[in-house]
Amino acid sequence: MTEYTPKERLYRALRKQPVDRMPAVCFTQTGTVEQMEASGAFWPEAHADAEKMAKLAEAGHTVIGFEAVRVPFDITAEAELFGCGIKAGDLKQQPSVIKHSVKNLEDLDKIKNYSLDTGRIGTILKAVKILSEKYGKELPVIGSMIGPFSLAQHINGDAWFGNLFTGEDIVPALLDFCADFNIAYAKAMVENGADTIAIIDPTASYELIGGEFYEKYALPYQKKIVDAMKELDVATVLHICGNTTNGLAIMDRTGVNAISVDQRVDIKTATGNVENAIIVGNLDPVAVLWNGTPEDVEAASKKVLDAGVGILTVGCGIVSMTPSANLQKMVECAKNYRY
């Protein structure tokens, strides 16, 4: 069989086309302290500096061996753009949302005039361009963003779930706003060189909101993003935390190319629950990759591969203290696998 470039290989694998072997990629957060030390680009500065962000993302390829480059390393830049307060994090901890900006429709109107060129959103787009110009012909460039449901929760805060249950007008209005922003942001990423979009929507977990609420408040808005990317021939990967086994069939209706599942999902069951998307995952980021040994990683990888995973990767974002040797072993296992 033809030997493909990493870019060609992932393009084909995400579209269920024959490939020479499994891609070795990560669709979730890739930054670790060891990569920071190797690259000289450290958190939290790398969250807000395009050159440092690109340099740390590059380390995922040059240090670990991932056959793709991916930015950013957190899911708070979007909320920050819309006036939310952010705790910057540190060398080991990612940024987090600590203050919310929209309580009602009047507040929502105040954040509608935004620019993608400002703040950390602009920084991320610059980092995508830097990476694309250096690696885009050979490697996939993955642009990641928080999904519309989780972004709405970040913006609306603790009131969000109460508003869902009482059917407040702010809910569909904010979800429409977030999905439209996601589409504009994803298109800007593509314009700057991204060829794959990862949608990280943790608060939309089936474990948290159930099938009825997912179908009403998450599915249509995620699907809008996916449909917009399909028009550009850009693959999409949806990651939602928790045991999403019983929700996979609904998630599959978004039309995404791949669904990323965490370590609590049984891969064999998961692959039987979807018709269109491939299942990617789902090594335990804590017990196996952070606290385990390369031998543990190899054993866990074999189990996941034998269960029929579409692409072997991490079950959630990589813990910043994860040893490079463990990630390198995961990459090796993926590269050695033939479908």
UniProtKB/Swiss-Prot annotation:
Q: What is its EC number?
A: 2.1.1.247
**Cofactor or coenzyme needed:** Zn(2+)
Q: Tell me which residues bind Zn(2+).
A: H239, C241, C316
- The question of whether Membrane is a record keyword is answered with no
Q: In which pathway does it act?
A: One-carbon metabolism; methanogenesis from methylated amine
Entry keyword Metal-binding: yes
Q: Name one Pfam family in it.
A: URO-D
Name the Gene Ontology molecular function terms of this record.
[methyl-Co(III) methylamine-specific corrinoid protein]:coenzyme M methyltransferase activity; dimethylamine methyltransferase activity; metal ion binding; uroporphyrinogen decarboxylase activity
What is one process in the GO biological process aspect for this record? methylation
Q: Which reaction does it catalyse?
A: methyl-Co(III)-[methylamine-specific corrinoid protein] + coenzyme M = Co(I)-[methylamine-specific corrinoid protein] + methyl-coenzyme M + H(+)
Q: Which family does it belong to?
A: Belongs to the uroporphyrinogen decarboxylase family. MtbA/MtaA subfamily.
What does this protein do, in the record's words?
Answer: Methyltransferase involved in methanogenesis from methylamines methanol pathway. Catalyzes the transfer of the methyl group from the methylated corrinoid protein MtmC (MtmC1 or MtmC2) to coenzyme M, forming the substrate for coenzyme-B sulfoethylthiotransferase.
Name recorded for this polypeptide: Methylcobamide:CoM methyltransferase MtbA
